[in-house]
UniProtKB/Swiss-Prot annotation:
Coiled-coil residue windows: none
Signal peptide: none
Taxonomic lineage: Bacteria, Bacillati, Actinomycetota, Actinomycetes, Mycobacteriales
InterPro entries the UniProt entry points to: Ribosomal_uS10, Ribosomal_uS10_CS, Ribosomal_uS10_dom, Ribosomal_uS10_dom_sf
Originating species: Corynebacterium urealyticum (strain ATCC 43042 / DSM 7109)
Protein name, per record: Small ribosomal subunit protein uS10
Length: 101
C-alpha cells in the first residue's frame, strides 16, 4: 500500500475520551511501522439551546444549555496490511465516533 493514506476523524462530546482514543490509535499505528500525522485538533462545534424555565408563564426567565462536539484528525501515511488489521481490532469507547476514509 505504498503512497496511500488513511484519514481518521474522531468526534466526541468528552474531550478526555477523544484524546485517549487518539493516543491509543497513534500508539497502535506506530507499533505496526506506519507514519502518523496528528492528532490534529479541529474546531470545537458549540450548540447552545435556550429553554424557558417555567412551563406556562414568565417568558423572560430562560435557561441556556450548551453541547460541545470535539473533533480530531489523524492521517496514517504508507499503511501496511498489519496496520489496517490492527486498526480493525482496536477497542475504543462507544462515546467516540470514528470515521475512516
Amino acid at each position: 500500500m505504498a503512497g496511500q493514506k488513511i484519514r481518521i476523524r474522531l468526534k466526541a462530546y468528552d474531550h478526555e475520551a477523544i484524546d485517549a482514543s487518539a493516543k491509543k490509535i497513534v500508539e497502535t499505528v506506530t507499533r505496526t511501522g506506519a507514519r502518523v500525522v496528528g492528532p490534529v485538533p479541529l474546531p470545537t462545534e458549540k450548540n447552545v439551546y435556550c429553554v424557558i424555565r417555567s412551563p406556562h408563564k414568565d417568558k423572560d426567565s430562560r435557561e441556556h444549555f450548551e453541547m460541545r462536539t470535539h473533533k480530531r484528525l489523524i492521517d496514517i501515511l504508507d499503511p501496511t496490511p498489519k496496520t489496517v488489521d490492527a486498526l480493525m481490532r482496536i477497542d475504543l469507547p462507544a462515546s467516540v465516533d470514528v470515521n475512516i476514509q
